[in-house]
Amino acid sequence: MLLLLSPAKSLDYDTPLPPKLPHTLPVFSEQPLELIEVLRRQSPQQLSELMGISDKLAALNVARYEAFSPRFTATNARQALLAFNGDVYEGLQARSLDAEDLDWAQQHLAILSGLYGVLRPLDRMQPYRLEMGTRLETAHGSNLYQFWGSRIAEHLNQRAARQPAGERVIVNLASQEYFKSVDLKHLKPPVVECAFEDYKNGAYKIISFHAKRARGLMARFAIQRRARSAAELEAFDLEGYALAPASSTPARLVFRRKTAD
């Protein structure tokens, strides 16, 4: 089983890392450098307009692109799972995972990325901002979906092929923006979606903040259970969520929560 996650805009390169934490390098080495060269040609104002960010954030990321190095070291990079710091990763709580948890996650978790394509949890990552939906023009097309093409799907195929035959399934916990980067025409394993709904104003609905956190909770649940199939995820019960069987299908698991007013 492979779990897909989105990255986060918020990054943490300040909190000390656990001692002797292992690391790997990103699976795509040339493509990030190609994108960095394109990004370096953007002025702060152009970057602000392209990404819809403030002048301050644009200046920060111009500096990040200039500092980006082909060499990933303990000084300029850190493991992706511990660098991301948004709602999903607050649910996942990577810092509380032990060495065996991280080893399992390294084999079963894939973080989709506009700059890196795919990151494994222990891949060193230099700080960046480049959302997958950014309309960045490159030699490969007018956006990042065209830039990455079928590469991400083919990488996921390779990772799935290394797993036991009965465990080759993709569990999508990523947003639509990021999952769109997986070319389904080339993807071989079946995909199972997970949806998280909260009760509000008389109906169950997806509430972005809660759904993002729940995706991280589900990833943590799978890691700690060493889940081998999507069926094992049906037992997910963290923070009040439970499977809604009548609203679920084998390809789409719906989890609902009704909190007290």
Swiss-Prot record:
GO terms for cellular component: cytosol. Disulfide bonds: none annotated. Pfam families: H2O2_YaaD. InterPro entries: YaaA (IPR005583). One of its GO terms (biological process) is response to hydroperoxide. It comes from the Bacteria. NCBIfam families: PRK02101.1-3. Belongs to the UPF0246 family. This is UPF0246 protein Daci_5283. It comes from Delftia acidovorans (strain DSM 14801 / SPH-1).
